[in-house]
Amino acid sequence: MSTINTDTNDTMPHISVHAQYIKDLSLENPSAPSSLAALDQRPQIDLSLDINVTNLSEENFYEVELNIEAIARNEKYKLFQIELKYAGVFNLINIDSEQHPILLSVHCPAMIFPFARKIIASCTQDAGFQPLMIDPIDFGALYHKKMSEHQN
């Protein structure tokens, strides 16, 4: 019979996800139904992503928010515009505070991104379009780019 020593788990560094939620969701389908008949070509997608981190009142608790906006156009129409603010509440347990910025800007967004991606795909499909499947995002590269821009 095996036993689990829970005392060591209390001191192991780890990230705990306390909640995930939609803060704001908006979908505009301004040219429907005309735009739905003109789906013979692949639309141009303009995508923007931003990450906001908020230190919450409880020690080592943070809200990490993904702000994703996508606008789809073809030659004739603005097909749709979707904006999503999706967030998670994270507790960084037994982690050196010097590591918090990279964890909150890279690892935490990577943990909640698949859920935000699914919401966007479902909403665009429900609007009558092919589901918008956002490619995986390299949050590490975004973080390092932002840090290098901040230093200059």
UniProtKB/Swiss-Prot annotation:
Q: What are its GO biological-process terms?
A: protein folding; protein tetramerization; protein transport
- Alphabetically ordered keywords of this record: Chaperone, Cytoplasm, Protein transport, Translocation, Transport
Pfam family of the protein (one): SecB
Using the UniProt record, give the first listed, main subcellular location: cytoplasm
GO cellular component, alphabetical, reads:
cytoplasm
Query: HAMAP family, alphabetically?
Result: SecB
Q: Which family does it belong to?
A: Belongs to the SecB family.
Under what name is this protein listed? Answer: Protein-export protein SecB
Annotated source species: Rickettsia massiliae (strain Mtu5)
